[in-house]
Curated annotation (Swiss-Prot):
Name the UniProt record assigns to this protein: 1-(5-phosphoribosyl)-5-[(5-phosphoribosylamino)methylideneamino] imidazole-4-carboxamide isomerase
Keyword list, A-Z: Amino-acid biosynthesis, Cytoplasm, Histidine biosynthesis, Isomerase
Main location: cytoplasm
Localization of this protein: Cytoplasm
Pathway note: Amino-acid biosynthesis; L-histidine biosynthesis; L-histidine from 5-phospho-alpha-D-ribose 1-diphosphate: step 4/9
EC number from the UniProt entry: 5.3.1.16
Primary gene name: hisA
Classification via Pfam families: His_biosynth
Length: 248
């Protein structure tokens, strides 16, 4: 079970939002590269970056901070990025700059042809982020709710050749209410590609619950507010996950 620290970027700073609300941002660091180094030193084996400004305007906005993170840790662990990735040129540029994966969210829903082209051109590097509330997909930085069912879209994207699905339960994100295990497992069981859980991770019990369903196709979890607030010690959590994954 891969625990993936999230670094959410707004105006060049590392922040956390509550339920995707840009007006409810808590700044945790003004030096995102130092934050990336911190998580690698704590044992992180992958990092999850989100360009929050980019997600809202539809093009990259925190480029300096992202490049600084890649320069700091990109040679050591994979780094994935979502937010504002809406065209093939942007994907190519980020992969050339050293990202391992790009995450396509809104554009996958609104422009499936683009996602198909991205998978063809950059196979093995494309992850889709599906953000949902009550099983329905949301887009545009969570500001618009669609009528699409998560599972229907995810299976379509699997056919396109995406590497994995990151499934976020919007209602739980940043609220420390626990991962929506049932919905995550249900999605993972309906496809053969890995699902990465997101939204609501709060304590070691969540880690236990996730590891219990790892064999169902839940490969990892994005760690957000809990590891910044101190509710969850990242090193302890990854050690526990490793132990459980090894059947100990």
């Amino acid at each position: 079970m891969l625990l993936i620290p999230a670094i959410d970027l707004k105006d060049g700073q590392c922040v956390r939002l509550k339920q995707g609300d840009m007006d409810q941002a808590t700044v945790f660091s003004e030096d995102p590269a130092a934050m990336a180094r911190h998580w690698v030193n704590q044992g992180a084996r992958r990092l999850h970056l989100v360009d929050l400004n980019g997600a809202f305007v539809g093009k990259p906005r925190n480029e300096a901070a992202i490049k600084a993170i890649i320069a700091e840790v990109g040679d050591e662990i994979p780094v994935q990025l979502g937010g504002g990735i809406r065209d093939l040129n942007t994907i190519e540029r980020w992969l050339d700059d050293g990202l391992s994966y790009v995450i396509i969210g809104t554009a996958a829903v609104k422009n499936p042809g683009f996602l198909k082209d991205a998978c063809s051109a950059f196979g093995g590097h494309i992850i889709v982020g599906l953000d949902a509330k009550d099983g329905k997909v949301a887009t545009d930085g969570w500001s618009k709710l669609t009528g699409h069912e998560v599972a229907d879209l995810a299976r379509k994207y699997e056919d396109y050749g995406v590497e994995a699905i990151i499934y976020t339960d919007i209602g739980r994100d940043g609220m420390l209410q626990g991962i929506n295990i049932d919905a995550t497992v249900k999605l993972a069981q309906s496809m053969s590609i890995p699902v990465i859980a997101s939204g609501g991770l709060s304590n070691l019990a969540d880690i236990d619950n996730l590891c219990a369903v790892e064999n169902e196709g839940v490969e990892g979890v994005i760690c957000g507010r809990a590891i910044y607030s101190g509710d969850l010690n990242f090193t302890d959590a990854q050690a526990r996950a490793d132990k459980l994954s090894n059947g100990e």
